[in-house]
């Protein structure tokens, strides 16, 4: 059971209109034959899988991509009838359930096809199982690596009375978000070499994650897996500029729960790692590393009533402390991600401070923090 903190003043706010705008801007770059499938894995990158999926559908997304079968089942349970592709490997034992729920699976080995076919036959499943063949062109994660392996799989899928529907074929580029396109070109050449053995391509041919779609449009195929950019986050971080403005959808706010005057020489938080050099005002914010706000963010800053305030002392499990410029009333707004007045703190800012990527920060926001949606 997940307990959501409905009775404390800390929340994630998700702007669904920003998500719709990002999708609309992306679709405006494509021809009308190219479909956009919204990637809503990992609880919609921390934004909320069901609410994001609904917004994406309203904006024109015609399908969804997830990482695990349970995410696809959650979408079906919520009433979504659109195509859903599970991008990770699903155990063959679940093939009958997948076929029943009309879900598509990524497949990367002949052994998987052989095992799943036997299981489908043993369970007398007559509904075809939708398959997208994954090609490993250089990501090194999952997929067929040689033309011979791929040709064998295609032959299996096209046998008479096959229990499979050969619905799609795809790859994933590892460096599409980098200015140096050397390795991208290497992968693209591998893709062309592999796919040449498929004499008749399936309905969906897709190579584009957000980065590929933004900066390598010439090889888009006929479907885009629109992921992190859907949420208004630049997949390249600060290295490449997006061809159109991305609107971040997520903000994280709280309110001060305690304010005190700290005397010079007094310390704050575990380990007494911060000691006041002079008398100062300290505010307590009801969020901590159990909420996904990293312990390593000591020394970073938040916005209190539009002013930057440093996080002092170690971030605790459920609370953190900030140094205030002056006495501020309990209940004052604290912005941890987002804009207050003329100042902004982005997920990218936090990621830079933590030495990671904004994906990790967004996905790490715990379900204990309630999500509030505006549209």
UniProtKB/Swiss-Prot annotation:
The keyword Isomerase applies. Keywords: Isomerase, Pyridoxal phosphate. Coiled coil: none annotated. It comes from Lactiplantibacillus plantarum (strain ATCC BAA-793 / NCIMB 8826 / WCFS1) (Lactobacillus plantarum). GO terms for biological process: D-alanine biosynthetic process; peptidoglycan biosynthetic process. Signal peptide: none annotated. NCBIfam families: alr. It is an enzyme of class 5 (isomerase). The lineage of its organism: Bacteria, Bacillati, Bacillota, Bacilli, Lactobacillales. This is Alanine racemase. Its cofactor is pyridoxal 5'-phosphate. The keyword Transmembrane helix does not apply. The gene is alr. One of its GO terms (cellular component) is cytosol. GO terms for molecular function: alanine racemase activity; pyridoxal phosphate binding. Catalyzes the interconversion of L-alanine and D-alanine. May also act on other amino acids. The active site is at 41 (proton acceptor), 270 (proton acceptor). Its EC number is 5.1.1.1.
């Amino acid at each position: 059971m997940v307990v959501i903190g409905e009775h404390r003043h800390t929340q994630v706010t998700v702007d669904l209109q920003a998500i719709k705008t990002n999708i609309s801007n992306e679709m405006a770059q494509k021809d009308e034959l190219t479909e956009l499938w919204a990637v809503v894995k990992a609880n919609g990158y921390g934004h909320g899988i069901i609410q994001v999926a609904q917004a994406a559908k309203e904006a024109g997304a015609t399908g969804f991509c997830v990482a695990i079968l349970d995410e696809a089942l959650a979408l079906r349970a919520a009433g979504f009838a659109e195509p859903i592709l599970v991008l990770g490997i699903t155990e063959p034992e679940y093939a009958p359930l997948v076929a029943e729920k009309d879900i598509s699976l990524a497949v990367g080995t002949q052994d998987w096809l052989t095992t799943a076919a036997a299981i489908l036959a043993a369970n007398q499943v007559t509904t075809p199982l939708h398959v997208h063949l994954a090609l490993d062109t250089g990501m090194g994660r999952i997929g067929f690596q040689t033309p011979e392996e791929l040709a064998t799989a295609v032959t299996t899928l096209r046998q008479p009375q096959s229990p499979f529907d050969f619905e799609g074929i795809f790859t994933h580029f590892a460096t599409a978000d980098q200015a140096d396109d050397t390795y991208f070109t290497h992968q693209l050449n591998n893709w062309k070499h592999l796919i040449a053995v498929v004499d008749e391509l399936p309905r969906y041919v897709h190579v584009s994650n957000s980065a590929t779609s933004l900066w390598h449009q010439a090889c888009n195929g006929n479907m885009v897996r629109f992921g992190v950019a859907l949420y208004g986050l630049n997949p390249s971080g600060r290295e490449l500029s997006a061809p159109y403005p991305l609107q971040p959808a997520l903000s994280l706010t709280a309110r001060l729960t305690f304010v005190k005057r700290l005397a010079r020489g007094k310390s704050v938080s575990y380990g007494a790692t911060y000691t006041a050099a002079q008398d100062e005002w300290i505010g307590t914010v009801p969020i901590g590393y159990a909420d996904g706000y990293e312990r390593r963010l000591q020394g970073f800053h938040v916005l209190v009533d539009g002013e930057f305030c440093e996080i002092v002392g170690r971030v605790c499990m459920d609370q953190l402390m900030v140094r205030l410029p002056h006495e501020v009333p309990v209940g004052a707004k604290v912005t941890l991600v987002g804009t207050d007045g003329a100042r902004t703190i982005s997920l990218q800012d936090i990621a830079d401070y933590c030495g990671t990527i904004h994906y990790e920060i967004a996905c790490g926001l715990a379900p204990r923090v309630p999500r509030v949606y505006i549209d």
